[in-house]
Amino acid sequence: MNYVNILEKSKNFIELELVNDDHSLSNLIKEVLLSKKGVILASYGVEHPVLDPDTGRYISNPRIMLKTDAKTDAEKVLKEALKDIVDLCNKTLKEL
């Protein structure tokens, strides 16, 4: 089973779904995307979540939407944002 499903993709738009997740990662990705040059829209939505009896967490399949201007490739910006998140985590690990 995939963790990420690409629902729609063009040069300037991408919509993806994170399987069995909550607001945490989706909100972080959205915030980092909004800081990137060329991003017109970065948003996410969560359908009504369900309680996972094994973890006690409310989970859903959040959908992340990214729209960029005509000069900016949406997939490239998304990959840059994800790399920035990984870099931040690595920096934090080194400082602990």
From Swiss-Prot:
It catalyses: RNA(n) + a ribonucleoside 5'-triphosphate = RNA(n+1) + diphosphate. Keywords: Cytoplasm, DNA-directed RNA polymerase, Nucleotidyltransferase, Transcription, Transferase. InterPro entries: RBP11-like, RBP11-like_dimer, RNA_pol_Rpb11_13-16kDa_CS, Rpo11-like. It is found in: Cytoplasm. One of its GO terms (cellular component) is cytoplasm. Pfam families: RNA_pol_L_2 (PF13656). It comes from the Archaea. Belongs to the archaeal Rpo11/eukaryotic RPB11/RPC19 RNA polymerase subunit family. Part of the RNA polymerase complex. This is DNA-directed RNA polymerase subunit Rpo11. It comes from Methanococcus maripaludis (strain C6 / ATCC BAA-1332).
